[in-house]
Amino acid sequence: INMVNFSYRNSSGYQELCKMVKSGKIGNVFHMDANYYQSWLTSNYWGNWKEEDKWLWRLSTKHGSKGTLGDIGVHIFDFASFPIGKIKKLNAHLKTFKSKGDKIKDYVLDANDTFISMVEFENGAIGTVNATRFATGYKNRLELRIFGDKGAVKIEFDDAITEGNKFMFTKDTQRQLSGKEDNLKWEEIQCEPSQTNFEKFIEAIKNNKNDEPDFYRGAEIQNILDKCYESSEIGKWVNI
C-alpha cells in the first residue's frame, strides 16, 4: 500500500470540482489555467529567509533544492492535471532573479524562483501552469480555472482545509433567438468535508487496497517536472 501526499487534494471543494469535470458536466475541456503564488521572498509571513536555514536551503541547488518548480510545482501540476487528464507536451521557462553568485553563509542562491509553462493535454485542451515565490500579497495561494463547452469551474484558496470547502461553477446558456444575453453568473458550490489523504491512506491499509494519489502518480508528476527542466534548458516544447 502506498500514497503520495499531494496535500491540496484534501480540499473538499477541489475533490467535488474534479468529479464535476470528470463527469462531463462542463462538457469538453478546451482551456485551463493554474497558478501557485507564494511571497516568502518578499515578506516575513513564514520567517526571515535571509537568516533561517530552513528557508535558505530551498534557494540553493547545492543543498538539494530544485527551486520553485521542485517545491511547489509538484503540487500545482497535480492540482492542474488531475481533473483534466494526462499532459501530452509542455513548454516551460524557469527564472532565477537573484544576481549570479549571490550567497548567504554556505548557501549559493541559484535555485529557480519562478516558472511559467504552457501545456497541451492528451484530450486536446491547452493552458498554463505557473508558480512563483515573488507573488507579493499572497501567502500561499492556489488558483485553478477550467473551461469547457458547456460550462466552467474555478477554485481559489490559501488553505486546503479551512478555505477549500467550496468552488465556483457556471453554465453559460446559448444566446436565444429572442436576443437575450448569455448568462454569465457564477454559482458558489459549498461542499461537505471529505477524506484527507491521511484518512484515505489508513483506510487503504485496513482494506489492503491502494487509493489515489499513489506512487505511480508521484512518478508521473516527477516526470513532468523533469520535462520542465529540459524544456527550459533547450527553449523548446518537449513531449511527456
Question: What name fits each language-model region?
Answer:
Residues 50-54, 77-165, 195-209:
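Contiguous beta-strand/loop segments that form the cofactor/metal-binding neighborhood of enzyme cores
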Residues 10, 191-195:
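Generic alpha-helical segment signature
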Residues 12, 138, 213:
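Residues that form or flank phosphate/diphosphate-binding pockets in enzymes
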Residues 9, 134, 220:
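Glycine-/small-residue-rich active-site loops that bind phosphorylated ligands and cofactors
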Residues 122, 164-168, 200-240:
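C-terminal helix-rich "cap/oligomerization" subdomain common to oxidoreductases
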Residues 2-5, 128-130:
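Short catalytic-loop micro-motif centered on adjacent basic/acidic residues
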Residues 179-189:
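C-terminal "lid/loop" region of Rossmann-like NAD(P)-dependent oxidoreductases
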